[in-house]
Amino acid sequence: SVGAGGLFMFFVVYGISVSALFSVPKNKIPYMILFSQLVDIIFMSVVFFRNKPIGEGYGKFFSVISSRWTFLITSFGIPFILSLLLFPEYIVVLFSVIIIAIILRLYLYKIFGGVNGDIVGASGEIGRMFALLLSTISIFLV
């Protein structure tokens, strides 16, 4: 079951994401979706790297994998390099979202002492939202 907080997050995150997509020229939408997906992967990998699992589930299983440097290279490095190569105009957005991910990670670890799969998934959606929002702002500033 989903609580009121989950429903609130759904409407806020997806409301902002859809608003950002409808605010840009139509020819930019596919690129923004691809960029936000790459940022989503980067965001989740920052939050999940060297995870201290809370509770049981897949998060505990994957925490063993996330403690390896190969995890960071494949889940952070590859999307990061692709983002820089495909979307050099969004470099400020990319670094801004990485800073937001680091801040969120520190906050989550302070509050919960670790993360589980639900928290990682929600953080990915938050990262996607910030990527779309900041990309939209950068389009109008350029």
Task: Walk through the language-model features, giving the residues of each.
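Multi-pass membrane catalytic core of lipid/isoprenoid biosynthesis enzymes
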Residues: 1-26, 69-83, 125-131, 135-142
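Interhelical loop and helix-boundary elements at the membrane-water interface
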Residues: 1-10, 33-36, 40-75, 104-130
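Extracellular/periplasmic helix-loop-helix junctions in multi-pass membrane proteins
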Residues: 86-95, 114-120, 140-142
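Transmembrane helix-loop-helix
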Residues: 23-33, 79-106
